[in-house]
Curated annotation (Swiss-Prot):
One of the primary rRNA binding proteins, it binds directly to 16S rRNA central domain where it helps coordinate assembly of the platform of the 30S subunit. Part of the 30S ribosomal subunit. Contacts proteins S5 and S12. SUPFAM superfamilies: Ribosomal protein S8. PROSITE patterns: RIBOSOMAL_S8. GO terms for cellular component: ribonucleoprotein complex; ribosome. This is Small ribosomal subunit protein uS8. It comes from Bradyrhizobium sp. (strain ORS 278). Keywords: Ribonucleoprotein, Ribosomal protein, RNA-binding, rRNA-binding. Gene3D superfamilies: 3.30.1370.30, 3.30.1490.10. The keyword Disulfide bond does not apply. GO terms for molecular function: rRNA binding; structural constituent of ribosome. The lineage of its organism: Bacteria, Pseudomonadati, Pseudomonadota, Alphaproteobacteria, Hyphomicrobiales. It holds the Pfam family Ribosomal_S8.
Length: 132
């Protein structure tokens, strides 16, 4: 299946799986999705992920979702920059999500990273999505 916006597809799969209290969800594999998942894992929003290779040559990523007291750890996940309307920001104007309780995930020249990492590295970039 071809998707025009792989990040929105990933976010939607995570959101839908958590609404149904699934423990795992799979998504087509790509380097960008893996680096986004690495940020979510390091920030504690998912348990982990694993890349699986199929005999046909395509890869798939299995994501282990995280729950606390039966409730999803990710309360809100929202796409900011979309293919029709890209949102870029400088390091000075990086958005704070819920007064610092959530994170923004950015695509920067130094790779995909959370907003606090971008502030530390003094780089801006495209705001992909926010998580709370």
């Amino acid at each position: 299946m071809s998707t025009h916006d792989p990040i929105s597809d990933l976010i939607t799969r995570i959101r839908n799986a958590q609404m149904r209290s699934k423990s795992k969800v799979t998504t087509p594999g790509s380097k960008m999705r893996a680096s986004v998942l690495e940020v979510l894992k390091s920030e504690g929003y998912i348990r982990g992920y694993a890349t699986m290779e199929h005999p046909s040559g395509r890869s798939e990523i299995e994501i282990e979702l995280k729950y606390f007291d039966g409730e999803p750890v990710i309360r809100e996940i929202e796409r900011v920059s979309k293919p029709g309307r890209r949102v870029y920001t400088s390091v000075k104007n990086l958005p704070r999500v819920n007064n610092g309780l959530g994170i923004s995930v950015l695509s920067t020249p130094k790779g995909i990273m959370a907003d606090h990492s971008a502030r530390d590295a003094n780089v801006g970039g495209e705001v992909l999505f926010t998580v709370f």
